[in-house]
Design a protein with these regions (language model features):
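C-terminal motif of bacterial Sec signal peptides marking the signal peptidase cleavage site
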Residues: 27-29
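Alpha-helical transmembrane segments
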Residues: 13-17
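Short, surface-exposed polybasic-aromatic patches that bind anionic ligands, especially phosphate groups
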Residues: 32-327
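N-terminal export leaders
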Residues: 6-12
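N-terminal secretory signal peptides
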Residues: 1-5, 18-21
Length: 327
């Protein structure tokens, strides 16, 4: 994580009716499950699933876009094959029920969740086992529906691990990190819910906002984020948790099959800035079924095709991830 750590840190008729109300409210009508589990990716009314089509454009949207790069192309930071010897994207694993938990020694222990993490033998690590990058490890425990995420995770050789930070998320809950706390991501957000997955694209629908990075952020966070990763107070830099929406003028029909659901999601749910990194880089899960040539066509979409939006109307409480519909 490119941080500058400023602080250490849902079948009855009634259910069908509720689903219809959710659609009318601008929230998702269903809770897609984590593949291989019965776990939903947070409740359907969680901020990740909120629709932002009607969110107002910020008055300084142009400045924010220019800071990220108005002429820079959109990038799928995921795909098939290898890059520098590692899978392209951020992998995750559904661990076996009862997977033993191991102790993790955290650099930012005051903002990390203790209690042990169910790290399997030879877990999938972002960038590969030999990577010196962000080295995220994402694990889903399928019986309790708990998501465990680590940043900068390294084995110690004695069965224990060390990591920069870690967060444990109840996927059945809208609980958030304490304000000011990081997670395994700079913004204090969960990572897995914001990743583009092949199974979603193959099904033709991504029902959530997409995790995105920017090269320069400011010393601020906006709900649902809880942590910043910069010392700059420049108001024209995005905050952690800043939301960008793809303009409706971008026609997904002009793009190949694997790209269309991504474009629709960016117009419907938008992108959330979760870390410092490269301009307009979207995060996703590596999968050998990705067609990298199709994904590269996303570069035709430029920063100027985005607007920065005000997502504050979604918030019910700053310490909850539950979102309310926009007018």
């Amino acid at each position: 994580m490119a941080r500058r750590m400023a602080r250490r840190r849902i079948l009855s008729a009634a259910a069908s009716g509720a689903a219809l109300l959710a659609v009318a409210a601008g929230l998702t009508a269903c809770d897609p499950k984590v593949p291989g589990t019965e776990c939903t990716m947070f409740p359907g009314n969680n901020h990740w699933h909120a629709k932002v089509v009607n969110a107002p454009v910020l008055s300084n949207s142009t400045n924010l876009v220019n800071t990220v790069g108005a002429t820079k192309g959109l990038k799928a930071d995921f795909g098939s094959g290898l890059w520098d010897g590692g899978p392209i994207g951020i992998p995750y694993v559904v661990v076996a029920p009862g997977q033993a938990k191991v102790e993790v020694d955290f650099e930012y222990d005051d903002e990390s969740d203790p209690g042990g993490y169910p790290i399997p033998a030879d877990p999938p690590i972002e960038g590969g086992a030999g990577s010196s990058g962000d080295r995220h490890i994402l694990m889903v425990e399928p019986e309790e529906c708990v998501l465990y995420e680590l940043y900068s995770a390294y084995p110690d050789g004695d069965g224990t691990w060390s990591a920069g930070s870690g967060a444990i998320w109840d996927l059945t809950s809208n609980d958030q990190r304490p304000l000011g706390w990081t997670s395994a991501d700079a913004a204090g957000l969960a990572i897995l819910p914001g990743l583009v997955r092949y199974d979603e694209v193959a099904a033709g629908r991504i029902d959530h906002a997409i995790r995105m990075t920017v090269p320069q952020s400011r010393r601020a966070y906006l709900w649902p984020a809880s942590h910043y990763a910069s010392s700059s107070t420049d108001p024209n830099r995005p905050a952690m948790g800043e939301r960008f929406r793809l303009k409706a003028s971008v026609d997904e029909a002009n793009f190949p099959e694997q790209v269309r659901p991504i474009i629709v999601a960016l117009k419907t749910h938008g992108a959330i800035i979760a870390d410092n990194g490269s301009s307009w880089y979207m995060s996703g899960v590596p999968d050998e079924r990705w067609d990298n040539d199709q994904l590269r066509t996303l570069n035709q979409i430029k920063g100027s095709d985005f607007v920065a939006i005000d997502g504050s109307g979604l918030m019910i409480s700053e310490d909850s991830g539950e979102a309310q519909p926009l007018p």
